Amino acid sequence: MNRPGDPTVEELMARIAALQAENHQLTERVVKLEEELALARLHRFAPKSEKHVDRLFNEAEQLADKEDAGDEDDDLVELPDTGFPPTDKPQGKKRGRKPLPEHLPRERVEYDLTEDQKACPCCRHQMHRMGEAVTEQLHIEMKAKVLQNVRFKYACRHCDRTGINTPVVLAPMPAQPLPGSIATASTLAFALVHKYVDGTPLYRLAQAFEQAGVPVSRGALGHWVIGSSERHLSRIYDALKLRLRSQPLIHGDETTVQVLKEKDKEATSTSYMWAYRSGEHSDDPIVLLDYQPGRGQVYPQTFLGDYRGILMSDGYTAWRTLNSATHIGCIAHSRRRFVDALKARKKGGGPPQQALRFFEQLYRIERQARDKKPDAGETQADCIHRLRQQHSLPVLNALKSWLDDIAPKVVPDTKLGDAVSYTLNQWDYLTRYTSDGMMPIDNNLLERDIRIFATGRKSWLFSDTVDGARASAVVYSLMLTCRACGIEPLAYLRHVLSELPQRATSADITDLLPCNFAKAAAARSNIDG
C-alpha cells in the first residue's frame, strides 16, 4: 500500500521510461564522441594516405572472426561471383638509382696523372693510357643576368643641315609582359612556377632572391603575379573556360581558401576555390579553379551556365541544381565514409569491413575493364559498359540489399550510420556510371589536382586580397592544365608570357592553349627525331 505522497506506479514507469530514453541518448552520444576521438587521434598521429587505410582494411579482414564474433557477424555476406577472373598481383617497382637523362648536355671534367706519376712503380718505364673510367654527376647552378635592351636612335643629318626639324627614330623592341618592370617573361615564369608548382610563399621567394644577390621585394613579386594573371594569363583562362563548357564530361568539386582582405567578410572567414576538370580521356585536358567568396549554388550555375553534358560531383546539393546536366555521384566519397567508420571502431571488422569488400570488388572490375581489349567492332567505352553491366551491377545489387538490411540496425548519428545513410540517399547517382562506359566511377581525377592546390595552401596559408586569390586561381588553373597535358610549366609560361604581349586583345590565341602547345611540342620533337 502506497503512503501518501508516494509516486504512483504509472509515474514510476514514466520516470523509468524517461531515464531509459536519456540513457539511450547518452549512450549514442558516447559512441559518437569515441568515434570522433579515435579519428582525431588517427589524423594526428597516423599516416593519412590510402595505403594506411588499406592496412587497416587488410588487418580487419584477417582478424574479423577472432575479434568481432557476435551479432555483427550476421551482417557479413558473401560477395556475388560474377565470373570475373582474379587480379594478378602487380609487380613491384625495381629499386636502384635511375640513370641521368640522355638529353642533358655533358661536360667532360678530366683528371690525369702528373708526369712523374705516369712512371711505372715497378720498372720506372713510362706507362701508356689504356682507357678511362667515367662517372656521371648531376650539376645544377642558378644564374641570373641583366639584359640591356639597347635601342639605336637614328636622325637625318641632311635635314639637320637644311634646318628641317625631323623626329628621332628609335628602333622598336618587342612589347614586354609588364611594361616598366625589371622582370622578363622568363623571370615572371620562374616566380610563378616557384609559387604555384613548388608551393613557395612569396616571402620565401623574396628571401631566395636576396640570397642570390638580387634584392626583390615581396610587394614586387605580388605585382608580378597579379599583373601576369590580369594582363595576360586570364586570356588563356577565359579561352579554356569556353572550351570546358563544350566537353561531354566535367568533374566538379570545391575546396576552401582564406582571404584576409575581402569586403563584408571577416579575415578568418572561409572562401572557396571551385574546381572543374574535363574527363580523363578528353582530347583537350582542362583543369580550372574559380575563386568565389561562398559555397552557394549560384557559383557553379554561373560558371557552367546551361551545361548539358555529364557532371561528376559529390553529394553537395549546389552541383545538383544544374538542371540541364546529367549528374553522377562519386563512389570514392561513399567508400571513404566506411573507411572512417572502420577507423573509428575499437575493433576491426564488422559492417565497415563488409562494405569495403564490396567497394574493393567494384574497383577491381574497373581496373580490369579499363585494361581489357575491346571485342571486334566494339569501342573501349562499349567494352567498359558491357563489363559493368555484366559484373558491376550484380555487386551493386548485393550491396544495396545489404545496406537495406543493416540500415534499421545502425545508430544514425555515428560514422557507420552516416556512411549507410549517405550511400542510400545517393544511390541513383552512385550507380549511374554503369549505364555509360564514358562515365567515371569516382571523382578522384579532379581530387588529385585539388590536392596540389591544398599542398601549396599549407605553405602560403592564405591570400591577402581578392585580386591575389583570383590571380592564384588563374595561375593554378594553367599549371594544373599543363600537368594534365604533360607539358613542362616553366617552358609553357616562358612562351606565352613572351607571345601574348605581342598579340592584340581580340587576336586568336588558340595555338597558345596548353593542349595545342603540347601538340606543337610533340610535332617538333618528331621532326627533330
Q: Where do the PLM segments sit?
A:
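Short, flexible loop/hinge motifs at secondary-structure junctions
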Residues: 1-178, 182, 251-252, 313, ...
